[in-house]
Amino acid sequence: MGADRRRHAEHVMGTVVSFDVPARAGDPRGDGPLGRAVRWLHWVDATFSPYRDDSDVSRFGRGEVPLEQCVPELAEVLEACAAVSTRSGGYFTTTPGGRFDPSGYVKGWAVERAAGILTAAGPAGHSVNGGGDVQCSGDRMWRIGIADPLHPGRLALVVTGRDFAVATSGVAERREHIIDPYTGQPPAGLASITVVGARLAETDAYATAAFAMGTAARDWVEGLDGYEAFAITGSGTTWQTSGFDRYLD
């Protein structure tokens, strides 16, 4: 890492969010773009965590406050979640196991917005990685390793690209919010699925929905404009959508 770059890892939202940014983005505890992005993530954690009794998500989920008395970003998230649920035929849900929890959308949305704070301030060529789900910005060519869920410590492949988002759902991640809504059980068929798109909020949510679909995911992702996918099945076989090759070396 040269003097013109800065890397920072922030423990927040139950995961580690890693930044790779130009040095001019500033200090993570300062008032510059990096500091503002870090503070945004902690605000999201305090506001949207279903594990904090005093968060807006928890209070709304318990019926203690109406949506109108919550932060406006909650309505924004719920509208986006409803759209993904419709597009996925109900495989994406904010009530896994019957409990209100929009985490399947919030993390990708929060990381994408953090990257947007950096972009708006001018430092081009950065990545924000939230527990393996990544928003990359600028003209720099990025290489993102995809873990092999059946062989811990190994990579299944490396995807490359510019100004794109990569999200993976699977058995290797902490994915307790992924439930097949039609069976009420954890989904079967896939060990992991990686989705590549332009914006992490939707890319991450689509990866969640696709993992819940299991074997039906391939045809579904093929029908999404601007998205590609690579999957590893429970037996170790792999498949990819028709345009995924563009992201491989």
Identify what each model region corresponds to.
Residues 1-249:
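Mature catalytic core of soluble alpha/beta enzymes
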